């Protein structure tokens, strides 16, 4: 099995895997969607009552939104994730919550103001902050305040969408478009628009591949003078993450997760 990276950034990856079957490709896709651990807020405690600032001014910590709505918004905020942490139900603390499986956050802010995700302060793990600090949570009016504590734990998208790391996970066969220069007049225009996609060229034919994602090649699907060949052992994958994990971390975890599952199956069959 060979892997070739076409494009890689912190949140996006496009790559080719050669030497696998369609069922293996689909297993990788499902793992990328459902089985990647992610940190997300699970429990939120609202502290209601009067709050005084340093000058003695009194604020009311009741919010203009229902507590459940604010808690739901907090749960959907992407958080930086440490894959060395434990799932709470598998932790040595017995599910009580400790520094190995739980991250504690707090928000303490006075109105009038808008509470953003950047106001979510990590108490126990300072590095595990929100991915984006500009996500609005709730707007506070004069004399209003918010004082909460929250617990974040690891989970997967099998349990809830807030634990889904990836989006747009897709794959397709490696495709080659054998274009007749005689029958397809715009081949030179495509060559100029998609230079990386040119695989080979002769006096009568030019061969393109859409592995690099050049959208100009879409015209070839319905054009005369084009012979498309698909290889069902080579797959082009792409996906992006919400920033809780990098695209590279996500892919490596998914591949190792699949390997572990196959190893367990082989062991069980050999017993």
Swiss-Prot record:
<dbReference type="InterPro" id="IPR022842">
    <property type="entry name" value="RNAP_Rpo3/Rpb3/RPAC1"/>
</dbReference>
<dbReference type="GO" id="GO:0003899">
    <property type="term" value="F:DNA-directed RNA polymerase activity"/>
</dbReference>
<dbReference type="InterPro" id="IPR011263">
    <property type="entry name" value="DNA-dir_RNA_pol_RpoA/D/Rpb3"/>
</dbReference>
<keyword id="KW-0804">Transcription</keyword>
<keyword id="KW-0963">Cytoplasm</keyword>
<comment type="subunit">
    <text>Part of the RNA polymerase complex.</text>
</comment>
<dbReference type="InterPro" id="IPR050518">
    <property type="entry name" value="Rpo3/RPB3_RNA_Pol_subunit"/>
</dbReference>
<dbReference type="GO" id="GO:0003677">
    <property type="term" value="F:DNA binding"/>
</dbReference>
<keyword id="KW-0808">Transferase</keyword>
<dbReference type="InterPro" id="IPR036603">
    <property type="entry name" value="RBP11-like"/>
</dbReference>
<keyword id="KW-0548">Nucleotidyltransferase</keyword>
<dbReference type="InterPro" id="IPR036643">
    <property type="entry name" value="RNApol_insert_sf"/>
</dbReference>
<dbReference type="InterPro" id="IPR011262">
    <property type="entry name" value="DNA-dir_RNA_pol_insert"/>
</dbReference>
<dbReference type="GO" id="GO:0005737">
    <property type="term" value="C:cytoplasm"/>
</dbReference>
<keyword id="KW-0240">DNA-directed RNA polymerase</keyword>
<dbReference type="GO" id="GO:0006351">
    <property type="term" value="P:DNA-templated transcription"/>
</dbReference>
<comment type="function">
    <text>DNA-dependent RNA polymerase (RNAP) catalyzes the transcription of DNA into RNA using the four ribonucleoside triphosphates as substrates.</text>
</comment>
<dbReference type="GO" id="GO:0000428">
    <property type="term" value="C:DNA-directed RNA polymerase complex"/>
</dbReference>
<protein>
    <recommendedName>
        <fullName>DNA-directed RNA polymerase subunit Rpo3</fullName>
        <ecNumber>2.7.7.6</ecNumber>
    </recommendedName>
</protein>
<dbReference type="GO" id="GO:0046983">
    <property type="term" value="F:protein dimerization activity"/>
</dbReference>
<dbReference type="Pfam" id="PF01193">
    <property type="entry name" value="RNA_pol_L"/>
</dbReference>
<comment type="similarity">
    <text>Belongs to the archaeal Rpo3/eukaryotic RPB3 RNA polymerase subunit family.</text>
</comment>
<dbReference type="Pfam" id="PF01000">
    <property type="entry name" value="RNA_pol_A_bac"/>
</dbReference>
């Amino acid at each position: 099995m060979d892997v070739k990276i076409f494009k890689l950034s912190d949140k996006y990856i496009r790559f080719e895997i050669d030497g696998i079957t369609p069922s293996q490709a689909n297993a990788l896709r499902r793992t990328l969607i459902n089985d990647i651990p992610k940190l997300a807020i699970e429990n939120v405690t609202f502290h209601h009552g009067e709050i005084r600032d340093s000058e003695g001014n009194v604020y009311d910590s009741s919010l203009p939104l229902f507590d459940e709505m604010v808690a739901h918004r907090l749960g959907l905020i992407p958080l930086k994730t440490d894959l060395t942490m434990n799932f709470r139900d598998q932790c040595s603390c017995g599910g009580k919550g400790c520094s190995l499986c739980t991250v504690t956050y707090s928000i303490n802010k006075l109105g009038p103001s808008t509470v953003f995700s950047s106001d979510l302060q990590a108490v126990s793990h300072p590095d595990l902050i929100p991915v984006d600090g500009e996500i609005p949570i709730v707007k506070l009016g004069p004399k209003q305040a918010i004082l909460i504590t929250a617990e974040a734990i690891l989970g997967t998208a099998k349990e809830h969408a807030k634990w889904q790391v990836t989006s747009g996970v897709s794959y397709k066969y490696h495709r080659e478009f054998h274009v007749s220069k005689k029958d397809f007049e715009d081949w030179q225009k495509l060559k100029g628009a998609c230079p990386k996609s040119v695989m080979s060229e002769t006096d009568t034919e030019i061969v393109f591949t859409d592995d690099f994602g050049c959208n100009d090649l879409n015209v070839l699907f319905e054009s005369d003078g084009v012979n498309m060949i698909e290889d069902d052992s080579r797959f082009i994958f792409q996906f992006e993450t919400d920033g809780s994990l990098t695209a590279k971390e996500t892919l490596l975890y998914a591949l190792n997760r699949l390997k572990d599952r196959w190893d367990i199956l082989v062991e069980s069959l050999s017993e």
